[in-house]
Amino acid sequence: MLRIFLTFLLFFCLSSISNARTINWLAHDFAPYYILNGQYQHQGRDESIISLLEKQLPNITFNRMLIPSGKVIQELSNTSNNVCALSLYKNDYRKEHIYFTDESSTTGLSPSIAMHKKLAKALNIAELKEVSLLNLIQDKKLTLGVSMSRSYGQEIDTLINSTPNIDLVIRPTRDSLASLTYMLNLKRIDILLGYPSEHYYLAKSMHFEENLTQRPLTESPALSYGFIGCTKNEQGAKDIAILNEQLKVIKKTQAYNDLLMRWLPEDLRPLLKSRINSTK
């Protein structure tokens, strides 16, 4: 009888070990999506959404791995890895090398421009009014700041790369937006391209929020979607299937929707809500 019990116990333990699951998440130092230190540590949008998924999956261990932001796609594309990342842009090329969820993991406003409030007033650009980036850089001759090697969508990328005789200031990607925000506050550049939550977080953390404002662009789509991506192998396929189902669950919660709004300025939150509601 004891032998039977011990055999059963051994089988149970081995089964538990074989069924133990871990999802390895790639995180990177890119506020306000991941905030690794300072006053707002661990209050990043993407890291908080991962925590919501973690609560939904108590039987799966979530392991966070910190890597440079420029290496995320490279690590995901390596089939010898078993890793996932949140809020990725999905295109045909990436889908050849990475599994993506059908459900979006994040929804946000598309790229906008930040500028001095005094400049917005001088140009008579009302709050929340969409402006044309082409008009600002070609007709108004404003100096535009951008981060090097970063995509802002096909239309904006093409506009920047193909418009002749524009005044462009480019900074390397690491901490480039913070550097450009500092330049914007000093009026060394006129306008700065980025995502609304990034503009808001940097202005707030650098104590420039009283000086700076932002406007949506006519060249940007209404919304920007991010998806979970996992390594394109057997384990990645299983992880994607599980995470896709859990996204359906958390996206119905108030906690999730609050996270989408966390790093948006108050005046842009109704705009995001209305645009999300219009897609339902």
Predicted feature locations:
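Periplasmic-binding protein-like
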Residues: 28-31, 107-112, 206-244, 268-272
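Extended ligand-binding regions for polar small-molecule ligands
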Residues: 47-57, 117-130, 134, 138-139, ...
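Short loop->beta-strand "edge-of-pocket" segments that line small-molecule binding or catalytic clefts
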Residues: 22-36, 43, 128-152
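Sec/Tat signal peptide C-region and signal peptidase I cleavage site
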Residues: 14-20
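Acidic, polar ligand-binding/catalytic clefts
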Residues: 64-138, 216-220
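Ligand-binding cleft/hinge of the Venus flytrap
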Residues: 50-59, 133-174, 203-209
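Short helices/loops that flank or line small-molecule/ion binding pockets
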Residues: 56, 65, 70-83, 162, ...
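Extracytoplasmic small-molecule ligand-binding "clamshell" domains
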Residues: 20-98
